[in-house]
Amino acid sequence: MSLRRMLLPLALTQFVASFAGSSMNVSITDISHDIGTTVHGVQTAITLFLLCMAALMIPGSKLTDKLGRKWCLIVGLSVYGTGAVVAALAPVLGVLIVGYSVLEGVGSALMIPPIYILATMLFDNVESRARAFGVISGMAGIGAAAGPLIGGLITTAISWRVTFLLQAAIVGLVILLSRRIVDPAPADRSRHFDVVGAVLSAAGMFFVVVAILQIGVNGLLVAVFFVLAAALLFWFFLHIRSLERKKVEPLLARSLFRNRTSNLAMVTQNIQWLLMMGSSFVISVYLQVVRGYSAIQTGLTFTAATAGILVSSLAAERLAKRRAQSTLIRAGFVITLAGIGLGLALGNNTSSVWYLIPGLFFIGVGVGTMITPSVNVVQSSFPEERQGEISGLSRSVSNLGSSMGTAIAGTILIAAEARAHPYAIAMSSLALFGLIGLAAAMFLPANPVGRRR
């Protein structure tokens, strides 16, 4: 099987995962009416999906070393597809939570890490790896940006249940395509799996995401959950230090956190997804609340961002040949900030919504330009035997960015509601995070890819 054909199932897997995370938002009201629950009940299912995926991403990634990357990919897809079918047939909220929140969450934690591990191992030079990550990251961005449009169209024209059946159909196709993938490194079932570390890291990440999701809802719970998360993660670091001293393989090696280049690139990854999901949330609320747009109209407006992501992702290989990865990350932040600036300058309450299109397009181009090199820098900073660990850590950081973007943007909107121009305040606040990301990118070395430890 050619490398290009191997890339197709990996990219489709990432598309499905990103689509699932964004398409539900436009179907909340229809789902709540159909299964006899409240909007809050459906939002709880979405929250539990995010929690399950975030908590299990690092343990799921580590399992790829023991059980094999291809095995984890296919099993993860199978679990995910089963969850999609269960969710499509759900008569009540409890069944929806089992299918969507639990099974799709567990499936995502198993199937997402192998995407990036296999891409890193199969494509072994900067240009080809940039092309691979460009396609994968492009599909991630398109899935996230086009999810509301596709979900809105299907929900309005047919039923929200069909969005889950569509996911199941794509997953079935990907499983067939994945059967011919050649895992470049055999599974090693003799490798130690750190169960205690998996529990501690999962619990710690669980409370981090819970705390983020409580921002703007209950300040006391935010503090309590962050303290719990800090305590569990500190216990986790003590645990892995103890295992390393005993010469036992931990869930994550402490040396992962000593790589300055990788650490900086993961900061940029986190902020990229924060900017993308945060700006998407703010602009969606603005269009629907202030402009009175429907879900379909809002989704159509976001095709500008989708087009920007697609254009920049398709150019990833050519850009990697001409510019250093660190330069592309910096350029991506600058373009994204320019897009936010255009939106603030042109998209006031009295202007035509068409004035938002240039800003959305620039945001899409900027995010698409920097996602690929950021992933490339992180994955390329470590040798093959560390790909399972760094992939899980990297995906967890990105998922945290997505959660933070929506939570922070929502909190700022609520806090600024009594003032004039709350949406402008929220977008300006996101721009400040973009400046932090740009500052982190400025400290990346000129040629970070290839510096492995």
Language model regions located:
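Central cavity-lining transmembrane alpha-helices of secondary-active solute carriers
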Residues: T47-S61, I112-Y116, T303-A315
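Hydrophobic transmembrane-helix bundles of small-molecule transporters
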Residues: T156-Q269, L275, Y293-S294, L300-T301, ...
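12-transmembrane solute porter fold
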Residues: L3-V26, I115, I158, V222-F225, ...
